């Protein structure tokens, strides 16, 4: 994912910064504790599409 694109995207819940995790193809919002999936290069930025982040993931 291009950095300039990532700079524009924000978490739809918190409006905060997102982290790109290439290995999992996800965008993480640490504030909302949610991981938004990226499918075929398209980020799905809907709260109901996100999975909750576990405490172990947040501490890493």
Curated annotation (Swiss-Prot):
Pfam families, A to Z: Trm112p
Which InterPro entries does this chain map to? Trm112-like
Q: Which GO terms describe its cellular component?
A: cytosol
UniProt record similarity statement:
Belongs to the UPF0434 family.
What HAMAP family does this protein map onto? UPF0434
Its protein name is UPF0434 protein NMC0623
């Amino acid at each position: 994912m291009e950095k300039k694109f990532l700079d524009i995207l924000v978490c739809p819940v918190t409006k905060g910064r997102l982290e790109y995790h290439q290995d999992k193809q996800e965008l993480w919002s640490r504030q909302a504790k949610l991981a938004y999936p990226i499918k075929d290069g398209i980020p799905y930025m809907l709260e109901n599409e996100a999975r909750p982040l576990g405490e172990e993931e947040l501490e890493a």
